[in-house]
Amino acid sequence: GFDHRGETVWPRLSSCSGAIDMFLLKKDAFWHNKALWTREPMIHLLPHWNHPGHEGEIIKVWAYTNCDSAELFVDGVSRGKVELQPHDHAAWEVEYHPGKIEVVGYKDGRECCRDAHETTNAPVKLMLRCETPDVKAGDSAVFTCYTLDSEGREVPTADPTVRFVVNKLGVISGTGSAVYDHEPVKSNIRRMYAGQISAAVKCTGKGILALYAYADGFEAARVYVDVK
């Protein structure tokens, strides 16, 4: 289910019981549910691998999967294959150092899926992605704003304050990121949380809708949507 406002304690604004947050961003629990309820091979690795200041500390690494087994690689070196029971998850303990962790899922002894996280550099560029297909006049379109580093990798810890601007074919009806964010929902300025912000735009007419995102010290982003 989805997070929703209420049923929580101050200063949180919402319950955090859902697999998808209030801003339509998928949490790790979403992938856990997918592993439990779907058959198409999938695997999801957590957490991300940006932990400055924690070098040398042990971090628990998990994988949610519907595969028979999962194998973790740290900088290309295997840290062991885990045989899985139904509804189980794979787990390892890894000493943190910047680099890359990757997990491979196997069914009947054959690789069928993989997921990976890599330590990134500082974020330098904003990006925008439209999450709503086949947008029509009168619809609300949902967008995700995120960041990339100098090598084009998404940065999961980025938290710049972002300002959204839309052309005359749309009106920003809401933005959202963290459950602790007390800015008005309709504000076009919001701080990113866990590397992402969602923005909802009401499409007021047919044509090319343009949404722009700006943040100090970042290359700006823009995205165009053909509204029918």
Residue ranges of predicted features:
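Substrate-binding clefts and catalytic carboxylate motifs of secreted carbohydrate-active enzymes
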Residues: 1-138, 150-154
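Extended low-complexity, serine/threonine- and proline-enriched intrinsically disordered segments
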Residues: 70-76, 159-173
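Solvent-exposed serine/threonine-rich low-complexity stretches and specific carbohydrate-binding patches
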Residues: 76-85, 173-189
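Short, hydrophobic beta-strand segments
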Residues: 91-96, 185-205
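Short, conserved beta-strand segments of beta-strand-rich sandwich/propeller modules, principally
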Residues: 98-102, 142, 208-210
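Short beta-strand elements
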Residues: 114-121, 218-228
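Short aromatic-acidic-glycine turn motif
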Residues: 123-127, 165-181
